[in-house]
Amino acid sequence: MNTEATHDQNEAQTTGVRLRNAREQLGLSQQAVAERLCLKVSTVRDIEEDKAPSDLASTFLRGYIRSYARLVHVPEEELLPGLEKQAPLRAAKVAPMQSFSLGKRRKKRDGWLMSFTWLVLFVVVGLTGAWWWQNHKAQQEEITTMADQSTAELNADKDSGQSVPLDTGAVTSQDTTPAQTAPAPATPVDSTAATQTPAPTAAATQNTVVAPSQANVDTAATSAAPAATETPSALPTSQAGVAAPAADPNALVMNFTADCWLEVTDATGKKLFSGMQRKDGNLNLTGQAPYKLKIGAPAAVQIQYQGKPVDLSRFIRTNQVARLTLNAEPTPAQ
């Protein structure tokens, strides 16, 4: 009878009351229980008052109660009915799973989007490559055309230049004929001298006659000598005329670091140069400004105009045929 009464009394007591009574029998405080179970004092107080904290899951609360029961030597089997009431197990909320067809449809859409992106990228790259190739091909064709034109002009200049030696030869032949015919008047003097040898007076006459011929020969020689001496003096004048364009403020100086085709035209439309220049070549041109230049390889030439370098970097970066006009800058008054 006493055992049944004790069992009924234990069932009447709640889980929190039984744990508090057992703690008090062992002489433990709530602080001591909280330190041993590594819990907050407020959590121990809520368990003894049969409160379920809102921020604590029921699974953790059941675990704390079981640890508390083992600490105060209360059988867990006796607390199970009270645990079901105080901390009932709650069904976990599970998010509804997306169907496989939805994920497959989204994956298919992403695949189409990726394929379209790659297609656009390939089209852009292809158009860029085609544009570059067309420009490069057009430049090469233009350079080839200009080179062919310059070759034809050089051949025409060579054909027309063959008649020049004939003219100079005619001039030299005309210049030499007077020198060759000049001694001819001396022959009658010699013949007359040969016929008049028997008479002494003739000998005197011979002497008197020969002397003027010799004088004429001497004067011809002396007159020819200044002419011969004057011809070298004319050379510095011609050389000065050749060197004069270098001192011209409108002179155009070009140095070549590689083979390059170019064409230079002055303000009158005269072509100062049109053709191919080889590596390490120099070119000095003088004409009427402004100059119009067409250069096949801008990176292979360095240009100076009026003592200042000409900037060709914009043509070198784009790798294009350079077409530019050089205007004359006014020189400061002396």
From Swiss-Prot:
Keywords: Cell inner membrane, Cell membrane, Cell shape, DNA-binding, Membrane, Signal-anchor, Transmembrane, Transmembrane helix. Residues 155-241 are annotated as: Disordered. Pfam families: HTH_25, RodZ_C. GO terms for biological process: regulation of cell shape. Residues 30-49 bind DNA. It is a single-pass type II membrane protein. Residues 133-334 are periplasmic. GO terms for cellular component: plasma membrane. Residues 176-211, 219-241 have a biased composition (Low complexity). The helix-turn-helix (HTH) motif in the cytoplasmic domain of the N-terminus is involved in the formation of spirals to maintain the rigid rod shape. As this protein is anchored in the cytoplasmic membrane, the HTH motif may contribute to protein-protein interactions to form the RodZ helix, which is localized beneath the cytoplasmic membrane. The C-terminal domain may be critical for determination of the rod shape by probably interacting with enzymes required for synthesis of the peptidoglycan layer, including PBPs in the periplasm. This is Cytoskeleton protein RodZ. It comes from Salmonella dublin (strain CT_02021853).
